[in-house]
Amino acid sequence: MVRVRFAPSPTGYLHVGGARTALFNYLFAKHHGGKFILRIEDTDIARSEGIFEENLMKTLQWLGLNWDEGPDIGGSFGPYRQSERLNIYEEYAKKLIALDKAYEVFAYPEEIEEIREKLLSKGLTPHYDRTIFEPFATKERKREYEEKGLKPAIYFSMPRKAFIHNDLVKGTVQFSEGSVGDFAILRSNGIPTYNFACVVDDMLMQITHVIRGDDHLPNTVKQLALYEAFSARPPEIGHVSTILGPDGKKLSKRHGATSIEELRERGYLPQAVVNYLALLGWSSPDAKEIMSMQEMIERFSIDRLSKNPAIFDPAKLSWMNGQYIRSTNEEELEQLLKPLLEKWNFIPRNQDWLRRVIIAVKDRLHTLEDFQHVADFFFVKPEIKTETEYQIKCAMLECADKLESLDRSDKNSIVEVFRSTIKKQKVSAKEFYSTLRYVLTGKHEGPELVDIVFLLGPNEVAARIKSILG
């Protein structure tokens, strides 16, 4: 069975790149009828926070990426938090020592840093091996460690050989002999390093495939060596392309919202975000762009992942979000907009009226947040000043008087007031309606004017005309 994992560190909010990685793993697992596992890599004690872990889970659920095993629901291969697996890492580090494939290092951190600086000063890459650390493994130093209650770090003895990696996305990647020296797998405080914990966890959790960002490619040689040391078969690994901003530079905050939390707050729908992320480095075989989660699951395959960097285009995301807003019914949009209406202090007259407003403006929305400036005039009278031609002004004030005494408030009756007055006053219909739109909304464009007039109602329309032109 296919088993994949998404293994974030709870040190911040879920970024666009991380969310895409989670999505690709999810789509791959579901396409093959496999399992999607959530593992929390929280061994960075100083930066890991519970609030970020909670947000990661809520964000994944908001995106619809529900896991089959994880820290909250458990599973057959737990625990699913690395901080709860420290005894496991220690056990497997000792196994490598017993196999003479790892060794204890009694050098203090500052001594290791001194070695590093000396190598750099000689123009050498800081590669370590046993011989460098042997001078520190004296009886005196070991006794000193014991007296202080310290534990030695454990380093892996990197084989002096080349490694070949057959990447699911990039093809054959070769790591030359000596490209990596010995490296720490367990720190003196008992915390594992990333590559060691990753290999032990993937091995014990029976992960079959790993899809991750290409920034992890340099880690692959260390991980392949560790699998070999454990006589274990590594999972099949694929490295997906980097996400760049529209300017071709690595995606960052200067390109706008880059965390999923920010996108959610700005009124993007989860279906649109997921759909757009899927197209960052992957394409459907039928070139379809708007797809449901199920459609993406059915179409997804690793061989359609691109080797080239993907461009994150906020304008394309907004366009796609607009498509999803237009396909969402008014009842759902009403529920989605409720917290925003409270935030903006927009008080609807009643539920039916609000839904009619939503129908009038939804084609103009790219995000839910757009509702604030597209539909604000329905809730708040615009504060404007305008110089209006005398005849137009007279015609509009006459309309206001007629609207106040109107018996019926249906669309046809209201429109007839304007038509008859325009004809009687012999004014330009185009100029009249343009002025009316501005007087009622404070804008020169927007929803259909007939919808605006009907939703505001004859009394409100008359009041706005008189307050500005009277």
From Swiss-Prot:
NCBIfam families: gltX_bact. The keyword Nucleotide-binding applies. It catalyses: tRNA(Glu) + L-glutamate + ATP = L-glutamyl-tRNA(Glu) + AMP + diphosphate. It is found in: Cytoplasm. It holds the Pfam family tRNA-synt_1c. Catalyzes the attachment of glutamate to tRNA(Glu) in a two-step reaction: glutamate is first activated by ATP to form Glu-AMP and then transferred to the acceptor end of tRNA(Glu). InterPro entries: aa-tRNA-synth_I_cd-bd, aa-tRNA-synth_I_codon-bd_sub2, aa-tRNA-synth_I_CS, aa_tRNA-synth_I_cd-bd_sf, Glu-tRNA-ligase_bac/mito, Glu-tRNA-synth_I_codon-bd_sub1, Glu/Gln-tRNA-synth, Glu/Gln-tRNA-synth_Ib_cat-dom. It comes from the Bacteria. One of its GO terms (molecular function) is ATP binding. Monomer. Transmembrane segments: none annotated. GO terms for biological process: glutamyl-tRNA aminoacylation. ATP binds at K253. A motif ('HIGH' region) lies at residues 8-18. This is Glutamate--tRNA ligase 1. Belongs to the class-I aminoacyl-tRNA synthetase family. Glutamate--tRNA ligase type 1 subfamily. Its EC number is 6.1.1.17. The keyword Nucleus does not apply. CDD domains: GluRS_core. GO terms for cellular component: cytosol. Keywords: Aminoacyl-tRNA synthetase, ATP-binding, Cytoplasm, Ligase, Nucleotide-binding, Protein biosynthesis. A motif ('KMSKS' region) lies at residues 250-254.
